[in-house]
Amino acid sequence: MPDVPETVGTPDGSTEFEHRPTTDQSFENALAKARNGTRLTVDDAVELFTTGTDRDGIDHDRKEQVLEAADRRRAEVVGDEVTFVANLNNNVTTACNTGCLFCNFKDRSEQFRSDYQEDHGGFTKTPSESRQIVQDALDRGIYEVCSVSGLHPALALDTEHREILETSDRGDLNYRSPDEYETDPATYCEQLDAMNVGDIHLHSMTPEEAYHARRGTDWSYEEVFSRLQDAGLDSVPGTAAEILVDEVRDVICPGKIRTDEWLEAMAAAASVGLDMTSTMMYGHVENEYHRALHLQRIRDLQDRTGAITEFVPLSFVHEETPLYERGMVDGGATVDEDELMIAVSRLFLDNVDHIQASWVKYGDTQGLKMLTCGADDFMGTILSEEITKRAGGDYGEFRSFQEYADMITAIGRTPVERSTDYEQRRVIDPDADVLGPQLGPRADGTPLLD
């Protein structure tokens, strides 16, 4: 893994990147191919993202043509259902020193050491705390727990891995003994085992975390994911992808694994029988050609594995990130770019049935609009530890089944509760007196929150 620089030069995607959004293709030809279902090329995707490289800026009429084509494709592939899952987010720790410039989630790992004197807003949970959080949410009716965390230096795959790290004399492993920290995060396997309660679906361990879980060893990703699977892992979130083009990763996340290693880890997860999701975090320093290359790499991975259940475009939220604070970006993607991202993803990824609209990223109004641009999934309830506390408080990002039913039916679509892998589905009656989950292991239709 490369060292994280203190500063990174500000690239102008139109002048300094090797990959530029220029093609020998025409917008009209790309749109025609999209409409008739011909597999698109990278150049086709660039033309659709830009609404024509022969134009300066996004052409509104052309954009609407792309959105219409994507919405028709969505209807052909998945119909008028809009799915969502009853889920919980339980992130183990915010401690991380990877230094990604787009991130405002992490806290410097040294702040968590037992000799650190100043207050900080981060957290690390013990396995027993994670288990209690999941147990409470399971009793409320959730189907899935999603857990994605910072790369805490004390985290190891299991006790064998910890012993290897403890005895290693290498100084490049990003490892410190848990004895040095106020709270011991235990191991990845211990955390997963703790969260593996009552047949809940456990969605965790990104490729970046899998790398962290094998550092200092010659273990394959297959070995790592097999051990995680034995601890209870059911599926893998395809986050940490950001943009799968190394010249972009060199700018926004130079401390993260490279594109090839991300793809290797995902293929390994699929090879041991784990389903996975896929993502793209866009709207920062990258250009349309990078976005198209990213989509091609996701599509190629799906051609090889068939294990990707959904694609999730994640619009960059720039506030309070180093990219923004250092003047490397002046904002995120525009609304037009967001809509075209959903649409082109639908048209390009002909082997991924489900495209998700993130209401957390887009907001409710624009999130619903994305469901007319090619998306068919509307995330999940995102119950969290803070929400499960009985005594008041801010419910934050939680979304109830009643809210889902009201919003989805308002745009003329059918609300459907789903499982993580989309194999289990339940059409929801928006006129029912009480709306709650029924697919979770302990769900009985009671609302998640009273």
Curated annotation (Swiss-Prot):
Annotated InterPro entries: Aldolase_TIM (IPR013785), CofH/MnqC-like_C (IPR045567), CofH_family (IPR019940), F420 (IPR034405), FO_synthase_su2 (IPR020050), rSAM (IPR007197)
Location of the region described as Disordered in the Swiss-Prot/TrEMBL record: 1-24, 430-450
Coiled-coil ranges per UniProt: none
Required cofactor(s): [4Fe-4S] cluster
Keywords from the named record: 4Fe-4S, Iron, Iron-sulfur, Metal-binding, S-adenosyl-L-methionine, Transferase
Pfam family, one: CofH_C
PROSITE patterns per the UniProt record, alphabetical: RADICAL_SAM
UniProt key word Transferase: yes
Occurrences of domain Radical SAM core (ranges): 82-350
Reaction it catalyzes: 5-amino-6-(D-ribitylamino)uracil + L-tyrosine + S-adenosyl-L-methionine = 5-amino-5-(4-hydroxybenzyl)-6-(D-ribitylimino)-5,6-dihydrouracil + 2-iminoacetate + 5'-deoxyadenosine + L-methionine + H(+)
Enzyme Commission number: 2.5.1.147
SUPFAM superfamilies: Radical SAM enzymes (SSF102114)
Positions that bind [4Fe-4S] cluster: 96, 100, 103
Gene Ontology MF annotations: 4 iron, 4 sulfur cluster binding; 5-amino-6-(D-ribitylamino)uracil--L-tyrosine 4-hydroxyphenyl transferase activity; 7,8-didemethyl-8-hydroxy-5-deazariboflavin synthase activity; iron ion binding
Pathway annotation: Cofactor biosynthesis; coenzyme F0 biosynthesis
The record's free-text note on cofactor binding: Binds 1 [4Fe-4S] cluster. The cluster is coordinated with 3 cysteines and an exchangeable S-adenosyl-L-methionine.
Enzyme class: transferase
Subunit relationships: Consists of two subunits, CofG and CofH.
HAMAP family, per database record: FO_synth_sub2
Function recorded in the entry: Catalyzes the radical-mediated synthesis of 5-amino-5-(4-hydroxybenzyl)-6-(D-ribitylimino)-5,6-dihydrouracil from 5-amino-6-(D-ribitylamino)uracil and L-tyrosine.
Family designation: Belongs to the radical SAM superfamily. CofH family.
Entries under NCBIfam families matching the protein: CofH family radical SAM protein, PRK07360.1
Name of the protein: 5-amino-6-(D-ribitylamino)uracil--L-tyrosine 4-hydroxyphenyl transferase
Species whose genome carries this gene: Haloarcula marismortui (strain ATCC 43049 / DSM 3752 / JCM 8966 / VKM B-1809) (Halobacterium marismortui)
The gene coding this protein: cofH
